[in-house]
């Protein structure tokens, strides 16, 4: 429940996106498709950040909600490619900054995404994001490979792209988060905690 509350605070309240809200929770149709949720949690088990990973062999946000961001390309459909969505960090609770002014929890969440991608046998993540997040990824050392040029969607300049599996990116996340190695701890089915 904490994760869905965080998503509402970030995507509806702060970013003012048009998202599905039920009470104080942000939940959409993709949450019903057995995604894997990757969470960054505090020592007290408060959710500090989250991201949703979904197989691209079924419905995805890129293919089914934002196909306009594909241009003339086909949506990725492969067991080797996951889709990430709903990436967010609670900057009110996770206040520790790492290099480049990026929140430390962001580096931990990026590392957990890479680890989870590998654990699922995938070699890439496709995502719909905005140009602000694209800059954060580049500064963090995990550059987004654009599918097409950005487009204005409402108040957001959005784009789609790939995040490839990379030893260099994973090492950069560990280093910038001040960690020695793996961050993922297995939790109940469909959830991973970092």
Which residues does each PLM region occupy?
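Short acidic (Asp/Glu) patches
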Residues: 21-27, 31-36, 60-72
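Acyl-donor binding region in acyl/amide transferases
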Residues: 59-61, 67-158
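Short, hydrophobic/aromatic-rich beta-strand segments within well-structured domains
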Residues: 37-40, 52, 113-114
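Short amphipathic alpha-helix that is part of the acyltransferase structural core
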Residues: 1-24, 29, 37-41, 47
């Amino acid at each position: 429940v904490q994760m869905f509350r965080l998503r509402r605070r970030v995507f509806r309240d702060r970013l003012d996106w048009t998202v599905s809200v039920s009470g104080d929770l942000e939940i959409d149709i993709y949450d019903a498709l057995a995604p894997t949720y990757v969470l960054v949690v505090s020592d007290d088990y408060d959710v500090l950040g989250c991201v949703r990973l979904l197989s691209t062999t079924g419905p995805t946000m890129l293919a089914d909600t934002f196909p306009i961001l594909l241009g003339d390309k086909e949506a990725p459909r492969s067991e080797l490619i996951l889709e990430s969505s709903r990436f967010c960090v609670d900057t009110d609770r996770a206040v520790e900054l790492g290099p480049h002014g990026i929140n430390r929890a962001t580096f931990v969440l990026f590392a957990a995404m890479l680890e989870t991608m590998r654990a699922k046998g995938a070699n890439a993540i496709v995502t719909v994001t905005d140009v602000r997040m694209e800059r954060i990824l580049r500064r963090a050392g995990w550059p987004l490979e654009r599918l097409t040029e950005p487009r204005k969607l409402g108040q957001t300049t959005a784009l789609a792209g790939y995040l490839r599996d990379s030893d260099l990116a994973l090492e950069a996340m560990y280093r910038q988060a001040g960690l020695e190695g793996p961050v993922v701890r297995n939790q109940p089915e469909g959830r991973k905690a970092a």
